[in-house]
């Protein structure tokens, strides 16, 4: 159950980061303030909840194991950037993502 909490904390952290990115997207000048407040508010909510869940994880998992698992954020953000904003990702970047996943598997299997 705690590993599910860790994944959820990671996803909420990523959601907060993606909301920050969305806040920077261009909108009409008369809607800009509302747009920024909405997305930054959502970012704060996601990041705040992620922090609470992260504290629960740290109560149950050694920090040396739990912290590297947050590298999942790099994977989630890359996937979201491609899907949501159609950002290009180089083969070298995908190779790095594969190494991150490999590292997470290796570190996670030591528990």
Curated annotation (Swiss-Prot):
What transmembrane ranges does the database entry give?
A: 36-56, 61-81, 88-108
Q: How does this protein sit in the membrane?
A: Multi-pass membrane protein
Gene Ontology CC: plasma membrane
SUPFAM superfamilies the record matches: Multidrug resistance efflux transporter EmrE (SSF103481)
The molecular function GO annotations come to: carbohydrate derivative transmembrane transporter activity
PANTHER family cross-referenced by the UniProt entry: 4-AMINO-4-DEOXY-L-ARABINOSE-PHOSPHOUNDECAPRENOL FLIPPASE SUBUNIT ARNE-RELATED, SMR FAMILY PROTON-DEPENDENT DRUG EFFLUX TRANSPORTER SUGE
Its quaternary structure? Heterodimer of ArnE and ArnF.
- Name of the featured protein: Probable 4-amino-4-deoxy-L-arabinose-phosphoundecaprenol flippase subunit ArnE
State the encoding gene. arnE
């Amino acid at each position: 159950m705690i590993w599910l909490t860790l994944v959820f904390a990671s996803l909420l952290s990523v959601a907060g980061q993606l909301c920050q990115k969305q806040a920077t997207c261009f909108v009409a000048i008369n809607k800009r303030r509302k747009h920024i407040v909405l997305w930054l508010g959502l970012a704060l909510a996601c990041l705040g909840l992620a922090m609470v869940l992260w504290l629960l994880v740290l109560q149950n998992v050694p920090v040396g194991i739990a912290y590297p698992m947050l590298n999942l954020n790099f994977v989630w953000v890359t996937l979201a950037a491609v899907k949501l904003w159609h950002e290009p990702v180089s083969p070298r970047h995908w190779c790095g993502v594969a190494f991150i996943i490999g590292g997470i598997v290796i570190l996670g299997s030591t528990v």
